[in-house]
Amino acid sequence: LQQYQVRGKVTGLALAAGAREAGNTLPGLSGASVDVEMTQAGGKASLAIASGGLVLPGVFEEPVLPLDQLSAEVRWQVDGPRLAVQASNVRFSNADAQGELRASWRTSDAGQGPRFSRFPGVMDLAGTLVRADGTRVHRYLPLSLPAESRHYVRDAILSGSASDVQFRVKGDLRDLPFNDPSQGDFRIAARVRDVTYAYVPPRLQPTGALPWPALTQLAGELIFERSSMQVRGATGGFAGTPGVRLAKVEAQIPDLSHTVVAVN
């Protein structure tokens, strides 16, 4: 069809993730209700998900993202091979976090050279979380970060919660996490509390070595920026030494692809 116009409402919608180009995939979803108006040139939709989820292959190590609730207003435009999508008033919650965001996405310019294809595209996303489970931070680190980095965060953060979380992703997703600042931004900053941080997790220690004491009851600022991770201005203590309190703790991994930790 060269021209069409559709208006309708769908409930209980489930769409499987599908192949698109060169190993890239389209996302899927489940448990959705959609009120949509669309033509061949684009459209708009009100999206609600209850006890469902999104499927994001190629984005996270765990591609299925369960959602207790999600609501969003979505618009899109189609111009030949070029696609653009804007999502506003996005509010979401699940067992790991609760927050809101806004985002825009478009296909990359395939005419820029052989390393470029239309997908995974160019993203501009900003959002906030009012609550987050610190032990699940690793689950939301993108696959563009090395597995060793993501697994270090998984094994090092043993407990804790976060509030006032700010996150930003801006740039061609092919370049994530944007180690060259001219390519874009990738940043997550959060106020954390009651954190237990095993900065040398047992799996990184030699067999038979005595364990390094974890930092406990940490409260401060946790920042992921490009390929780095930092703990700033934290207070806390060491496991097994309840009478010792620490102030102004600073911990840094300058490059998560090489897990070298500095703690002051």
Language-model-detected regions and their locations in the chain:
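Membrane-proximal interfacial segments on either side of biological membranes
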Residues: 1-86, 97-234, 238, 243-264
